[in-house]
A protein has these predicted regions:
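Catalytic cores and adjacent flexible loops of soluble metabolic enzymes
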Residues: 1-123
């Protein structure tokens, strides 16, 4: 996919090395992530203060709620990956507790766009 020049998102949740797994290319965007379901505040101590100062274009969110995704946007993340479910209570699959239901996802999109517009405007 990368060699076909297709847009590719790579979450680096388990990547422990300083260098990136592939050389930087225009069609690759890396996402900051902690591969734990769900993550806690303690797991996010190394969360980027400013995504523009990193190799990460965005955040792969495994936190409960939408607050960390919104924080990432406020810190310059251009891409948010968030799990989605129609009903968190319909299964025991661990991803569902941290997934966004339709209303939460809508809030994430609307508030995230508002934050992004304010940043773009220079506020």
């Amino acid at each position: 996919i990368v060699n076909l020049n297709k847009k590719t998102f790579i979450s680096l949740g388990m990547w422990e090395k300083k260098e990136l797994p592939l050389e930087k290319r225009e069609n690759i965007d890396y996402l900051w992530c902690k591969s734990k379901y769900p993550t806690t505040n303690d797991d996010l101590k190394n969360f980027p203060k400013n995504f523009k100062d990193t190799d990460y274009a965005g955040y792969s969110d495994h936190n409960i709620g939408i607050d960390m995704a919104l924080l990432a946007i406020s810190r310059g993340a251009r891409i948010i990956e968030k799990h989605f479910t129609l009903d968190k209570t319909s299964t025991v699959i661990r991803d569902h507790v941290l997934s966004a239901e339709p209303e939460e996802f809508s809030d994430l999109v609307n508030i995230g766009r508002s934050i992004y517009e304010k940043i773009k405007f220079g506020i």
